[in-house]
Amino acid sequence: MKLVYQLALTQIKGVGNTLAKQLIDHCGSAEEVFRSSKKQLMLIPGIGERVAGNILHKEVMNAVEKEVAFIDKHKIKVLFWSEPEYPVKLKQCIDAPVLLYFKGNANLQTKKVISIVGTRNASEYGKSICEEFVASFRQEDVLVVSGLAHGIDSFAHEACLKNQIATVGVLGHGLDRIYPAINRTLATDMLKNGGLLTEYPSGTNPDRQNFPSRNRIIAGLADVTVVVEATIKGGALITAEIANAYNRDVCAFPGDIKRQSSSGCNHLIKTHRAHLISSAKDLAYLMNWDLTSEKKEEKQLSLEIILNPEEKHVFDIVKESGSIGIDALAYKTNLTQSKLAILLLELEMKGVLIALPGKMYRTP
């Protein structure tokens, strides 16, 4: 019965996501919203006589019966804003949808979530970058989110499936259809290692106005949004702007300055709205993520052979400290900062130290 009230809350005329959350905060649950009297509802800020009447109208409850049957038949999970199953990263966003429909097996609470977006008219360059970038995470516990559209979205999902990486497609319509239709097989395959997610009930068409709203979910689910290839006037840049508004990291691959399909990425980088990256290692560095693949690629040479005594001394202190700033390191090594800077650069070049933001250093 709880599900019926949750669904009904999203069907009320005049009640959007913000007001729905406000109703839940005041009443305690979706069920209590509908058990409240008109007088009680009108005491809540933003609820006037008309909206209170809409909430208590019997047609609201009757309208969700068909949706409940669809959910049961297709084994769809309903993720409600006030419940622990709701994606934590998305819940932090002020305009997050109050309810989501999810079909699949992905863990939406995965610690490392990457959104990949880009143009529908991807070039071979964009496709190659996307596939290579995704493949770099095949040994990592990551979730890749995209929009199941033509072009970069599809390439990202396909590369994930090829490399056994969980991937979720966020839709701008109900789960009773797939748009574009050519991606039906891809969508079915994603249910085995990932899934499909939408805020829209069954029967919702892929109308144009739905996709900017869809983009906020793509941005909100992730720690970082990566723009692979995009024009200036594309949906990918909308997603990037939303991610920036959420104070999430945005990265972009640079492209040919004369190629229209790279103009959006270059613009994001030029205007400091995205970090320039050229590989998964660049992203891992930015996010301070450890990559399993990097550890396995370490050279099996002893430190005594590849490091001179001064380098070995600096390395040992960094390793013992876990991570350390250059000032503290200069104090512990009794070296000048200029001398230390040279040694640190040499250690970075040899792959035994990693530089972090804020002049911090750690071992791989």
Language model features: what each stretch is:
Residues 1-85, 268, 326, 350-359, ...:
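Short, small/acidic-rich helices and loops at N termini and domain boundaries
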Residues 3, 72, 80-364:
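Glycine-biased, small-residue-rich flexible motifs in mid-sequence functional cores and linkers
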